[in-house]
Amino acid sequence: MTRENIPTSNVPNVPPRILMGPGPSDAHPRVLQAMMSHMIGYLDKDFMLILDEVSALLKNVFMTKTNLTLALSGTGSSGMEAGLSSLLEPDDTVIICANGFFSERMIDMATRIGANVIALKSEWGEPFPPELLQQELANHSKVKLVTAIHAETSTGILQPLEDLSKLTKDNEALFMVDAVTSLGGQRVAVDEWNIDYCYSATQKCLGCPPGLSPAALSPQAHERIKTRTHKPVSWYLDLSLIANYWGFEHVYHHTAPVSMILGLREGLRIVLEEGLETRFHRHSKNASALAAGLEALGLS
């Protein structure tokens, strides 16, 4: 094929835009600059130090001291599927607190794994009521996992997690939380709320391009994975293998997205430079101002 015959876009250079949709958000210029750094091997000793730094930065943002923190190669859905496929075996019972689009995706994924899925559905646009979970847990003695969405992208609802977590722990199940939309913009207190597996994505409140799913894994969740009867159905999303790469031993699993990880490191630095509480306040203040402006226009 000659150069003249190569298909070209009618818009070869997309102009800069201010992104105001549900995601991705605009990437910080410092993040984009960091991603332009020269390439380095994913097993280079200096890159291992970068992984350790990213893990430490994630501990601060996830508000955890004991959890293993890492970033999966893929968007937030990879974090979702990694958690479900690693923590559930066929016929395990999982309760999914469903009040929006992405909890419906959880139901689909868990069903494909072969789990016994209990889909507790409540009204979209409203927080999930803890009493529904309490009633269902009273009817099932062998629930292995309970899942919830912290900030549901499809409706904008921020879900209180303390009551859901307590009910889950009182029934000796693991608690998995989707923080794709909230991490870096709202408080995500993994240790305080006893979350066993929490995952997010880089393209929203962390100010990075899409492509990584930061996650925090509790010792209890890690032990559940290590003592499985069968290997997870997904090799690529097996959290035990990914943890071996991000952990102390740094055992090769797959080719890590070096540039994305460099960008995430810079994005996390920016988050912590601003300060978590300051950042949370800014997001809440701006969200309230936007809502007030829309209501003033007669929108709801």
Q: Which residues fall in each region the model found?
A:
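A glycine-/small-polar-enriched, mobile loop at the entrance of the PLP active site in fold-type I
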Residues: 16-73, 77
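General beta-strand structural signal in soluble alpha/beta enzymes
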Residues: 19-21, 70-73, 96, 119-120, ...
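Active-site phosphate-binding strand-loop segment of PLP-dependent enzymes
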Residues: 127-184, 197
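Conserved active-site segment immediately N-terminal to the catalytic lysine
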Residues: 191-203
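Conserved beta-loop-alpha segment that forms the PLP phosphate-binding cup at the N-terminus of a helix
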Residues: 67-99, 103-108
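Basic/polar N-terminal segments that are highly enriched at the extreme N-terminus
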Residues: 1-14
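Active-site C-terminal subdomain of aminotransferase-like
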Residues: 26-27, 203-291
